[in-house]
Amino acid sequence: MAGARAAAAASAGSTASSGSPPPQEPGLWELLEEFSRTQYRAKDSGGKSGSKVERIEKRCLELFGRDYCFSVIPNVNGDICGHYPRHIVFLEYESSEKEKDTFQSTVQVNKLQDLIHRSKMARCRGRFVCPVILFKGKHICRSATLAGWGELYGRSGYNYLFSGGADDTWASTEDVTEEDFVLRSGDTHLFDKVRGYDIKLLQYLSVKYICDLMVENKKVKFGMNVTSSEKVDKAQRYANFTLLSIPYPGCEFFKEYKDRDYMAEGLIFNWKQDYVDAPLNIPNFLTQSLNIDWSQYQSWDLVQQTQNYLKLLLFIMNRDDDSGLLVHCISGWDRTPLFISLLRLSLWADGLIHTSLKPAEILYLTVAYDWFLFGHMLVDRLSKGEEIFFFCFNFLKHITSEEFCLKTQRRKSLPTRDAGFTVEDICMLRHKDRGSTTSLGSDFSLVLEHSPGAVGSFSYETVELAPAGAPTQAAWRKSHSSSPQSMLWSRPQPSEERLPSHHGLTEAKSSSSSSSNHSDNFFRMGSSPLEVPKPRSVDHPLPGSSLSTDFGSWQLVSGCGSIQDRPVLHTDSSLPFSFQDELPNSCLLTALSDRETRLQEVRSAFLAAYSSTVGLRAATPSPSGAIGGLLEQFARGVGLRGTSTSTL
């Protein structure tokens, strides 16, 4: 545990070592202070707090307007929903001329508003299906789960159903079955009516996939079923949708995350609890292309579970159809914003949405819109230690790898094989694969391709190495462009895989590829240091390298390290590579990618702002003080704070 805490502290301090604070969004600290002080309510628009909320709302509209043409659905005073934004943004199309011609919404806002008003009572707390992300013309939506009879009738009568959901208290109701109550009410068509409008809204938004994060089939409160879900609708009203039951722990579980000094690795949910009755259920056509053993989901820790669910959601959105996606939990303000935020940030990091926003700006938009304005109760969660909000942005370090990337790679003559590698991977070839820049008698193909934003790549355009048996030649063509590039290598799969066992090496598990599928494509163990050119000395290693040593005019970088400077190769020189006899059939070693850089900047900006406003609450005093001083160390290192004034 102490080692894990030290690693976390080192991660936070890596940016601090650069001596410059991460870029900050004006107003982010004010947003976090307001967020940690009170829960947002659409009807509370007066006074000092109201002016702050107005600034937050205005800033969100500005940030959406950078890249999208959108309409605003008014929710003044919470007329539609008391804990949805007062200005609900409906994204119509990207404002760039290219994207405008490619994807354009066919939704009429007036009709959408009408369906929203009619369908709002169908879902828990009036939290209707709301589109929040536009990707390739498809809407990613959020909502609460379906309201059960207990909510429909058990609050303050029918008046509540049309009041905008201002009253969140639960009323006592006789514990009878849903069927009995419907018969007693004399309105046997009530569920057909309200859920029928909900279905019409989903269809109007072209939503086909519904992802249910609940660990229960129905939420039981005060001895009665207060909510339901699409997967247990007795009338099978949602049979035409693709329903996915992907149970994920509720906010209560994140108290254990906090009590473990904010370490998610090794934290496994107890699936044997009495109230947990919703098994994982995903259609086969969605799982066949993902190298994940879904039958083992109950053995995944929090990191693996979150990673695999995010991969599934990204895969669904990247399918070649026009179908949208709905993500929901029970109330839709804890687990739902977690995955909506991760989807938004992951797609942004790939340059696929919000393309003009900087890291600090996308962070502000995500915190403000996905969490604050959609009613996450941060004050209550902090008081209980249920820090799912902090987990979300701290988790970005686990999704930096290319396995989460949806950006299409532009390849030049790459054989159809599984693994992709950078130039460093040549160093990992077996002895029989050794060669030079002019003659390589090996059994692999190598292609250099553009990888926008990659750090430390060669400024050469093409390298092609032919398979064994053919005349082999590698030509380096110097490029006038400064755009970064990467190198991909694939070779036949051997019948057996063995990880190398080298004396004196330490195990290094990549936090961004700790998925439970144990894919062969991803590096997991430390390997012998490999040589890469070092044109000049480097004072500070890049974050992510586990071993870095200077050796003459070369720099030794471990298998999971990154090239720290742009190396220079000459056309008349041999590649200064060393090889190993026994290595895994495939592994992934990358320079710091554009995706990783962007997500790291978002996470760093969040930690800096969070440390100065909210701060971490240590569960128990730690002798090492590692977690207690995690954010404090970060803030001091980047010059954000002189002396501590709050308890972290």
From Swiss-Prot:
Residues bearing carbohydrate: N225, N240, N517
Cellular component, GO annotation: perinuclear region of cytoplasm; ruffle
GO function terms (MF aspect): phosphatidylinositol-3,5-bisphosphate 3-phosphatase activity; phosphatidylinositol-3-phosphate phosphatase activity
Comp. bias intervals (Low complexity): 1-19
Amino-acid positions noted as binding a 1,2-diacyl-sn-glycero-3-phospho-(1D-myo-inositol-3-phosphate) in the UniProt annotation, renumbered to this chain: G332, W333, D334, R335, R381
Catalytic machinery residues: C329
EC number(s) stated in the UniProt entry for this protein: 3.1.3.95
InterPro entries (alphabetical): MTMR14, MTMR14_PH-GRAM, Prot-tyrosine_phosphatase-like, Tyr_Pase_AS
Residue ranges of the region described as Disordered: 1-27, 471-544
Modified residues (Phosphoserine): S516, S528, S578, S622
Entry's localization field: Cytoplasm
Family: Belongs to the protein-tyrosine phosphatase family. Non-receptor class myotubularin subfamily.
Identification of the protein by name: Phosphatidylinositol-3,5-bisphosphate 3-phosphatase MTMR14
Taxonomic source organism: Mus musculus (Mouse)
Gene name in the database record: Mtmr14
